Amino acid sequence: MNVREPNETVDMDHIFGTLRSELLRLTVDFGLGAEEVVVTTPLTPTEAIGNPEDRDYPIITGRETMLQAVVRDAAGQAFTDMAGEYSASVQEIANMPLTNNFRRAVFAATLNAVVRYAGLVDVSRHCKDEAPRRCAEEVGTWIAERFGFEDESLTPNNDLRILIVGFQPRLIERMAASYHVRVTDLDAANVGGEH
């Protein structure tokens, strides 16, 4: 695992290049190159996350929408601030220039669908209703069991730093209760604030 120093920047082109390489590898390994991907958007908030009691999710407040890509029978999703419909082969999507948020969301949703199809992940769609709160607790437990405690006394490891990509309110609440958390988000309303 490569660990970066705290002040070291992350090159998004490098990250997407790595993801592109993996998507192309999976495309070859599973014979998906010519397989058509159909991206439908926007999913309604109810289709995307159900009807959770908490109403501060960006898709509910209207700041984001969700794309869904389907590869064979596997679906993958990605949040975006640019809505649209799209249809292309997995190979075309894997090689397209990622010049705007719509294209990046199509790429991410397709990658999520492909890794789901390949059996590398069990879930590639957003959880619904009250599941985001349960999911945050499960993620918190998973992190604590593997990385989060300094010793057997269950003292939180206050040196553990967690990065959350995208504004996920319940996950942020759960992680911030025990750890140092940084959140990246494209929505300027979420930048620089404390939640």
Where are these regions (language model features)?
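Histidine/lysine/aspartate-rich catalytic loop segments that bind and position anionic ligands
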Residues: 167-194
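Electropositive, gly/pro-rich neighborhoods at or near active sites that engage anionic ligands
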Residues: 2-169
